[in-house]
Curated annotation (Swiss-Prot):
EC number: 4.1.1.37
Taxonomic placement: Bacteria, Pseudomonadati, Pseudomonadota, Betaproteobacteria, Burkholderiales
Name recorded for this polypeptide: Uroporphyrinogen decarboxylase
Main location: cytoplasm
Annotated site (Transition state stabilizer): D77
InterPro entries assigned: UROD/MetE-like_sf, Uroporphyrinogen_deCO2ase_HemE, Uroporphyrinogen_deCOase
GO molecular-function terms, A-Z: uroporphyrinogen decarboxylase activity
Organism field: Cupriavidus necator (strain ATCC 17699 / DSM 428 / KCTC 22496 / NCIMB 10442 / H16 / Stanier 337) (Ralstonia eutropha)
Annotated GO CC locations: cytosol
Pathway recorded for this protein: Porphyrin-containing compound metabolism; protoporphyrin-IX biosynthesis; coproporphyrinogen-III from 5-aminolevulinate: step 4/4
Protein's cellular compartments: Cytoplasm
GO BP of this protein: protoporphyrinogen IX biosynthetic process from glutamate
Amino acid sequence: MTALQNDTFLRALRRQPTEYTPLWLMRQAGRYLPEYNATRARAGSFLGLAKNPAYATEVTLQPLDRYPLDAAILFSDILTVPDAMGLGLSFAQGEGPRFAHPLRTEADVQKLAVPDMASLQYVFDAVSEIRRALVQDGRQRVPLIGFSGSPWTLACYMVEGGGSDDFRTVKAMMYGRPDLMHRILEINAQAVTEYLNAQIEAGAQAVMIFDTWGGALADGMYQAFSLAYMRRVLAGLKREHDGQQVPAIVFTKGGGLWLEALADTGADAIGLDWTVNLAEARRRTGGRVALQGNIDPTVLFAPEAAIREQVRGVLDSYAAAGGSDGHVFNLGHGISQFTPPDNVSVLVDEVHRHSRKLRAGQK
């Protein structure tokens, strides 16, 4: 096992003391970076990028070479799992993901099966290659995060056949044929568990479950159709590898109503979107979990002084409820492709600067 130069992120997830608040950014390797766009052009397509371990490694490291971030996250897509199930994933320019074979009928659902993880070997190869590429002067620069979509979020795409404004197709199935919905979710939960465990075996040092569309569910439906299946995944995860604890983060966008329940899933940390007050979230979760988040990504379009002010507000809010440890700074959702890269430098600088001051007892 290669020692880490910077383990601040992992210590924060374990709610241990840190010298400053670590940060990484959702979609930190992405279209806002010109170097990413150059690599994607060489790859020829998004899937050409995501399915090539050398390209995936290259783009994973790009934001780390530009900014002093405290974690790397595997470059991939949440829809690799349903693609491996045979649903026929494609990305049309400017249109987002599409599945050629969405799950619409009972027969479609009956045919669904957990994919052979060998069909996702390109993901695990990328994890291993990124781990090797992170080593500098005999030590690994920062930890590597692996990830998956939640069973419910994957099901949304699998039934709708792509993105949706109202999720009426998947919700109609949920309300009208809950038996079919539960079968999809059971298969997805098993697949996600195996997928994340394979990432851990390949070298992921923390994992995150993205429940992007959990917040589209009504109270009661969320607990039955999203939370229950994330809990099942978490119960099946390898939580130790190479003698090291592997922390797990869960993030339900729009999930502020259910923080107490999320804190009881067995996750080490909860990701929060920008609608949640951090001090209040900390009180509600009772210090049982670390918290990750949660600045509004559009703050990055503001002038420098405003970015710094908003960063301080997030850090101060968390610290007001009992000190700064146990917090990973992040955006409340993925970074916009239109974000000026220089503004990200301002955000990263202010997070590190102000969080050090807070720990030193200064304002």
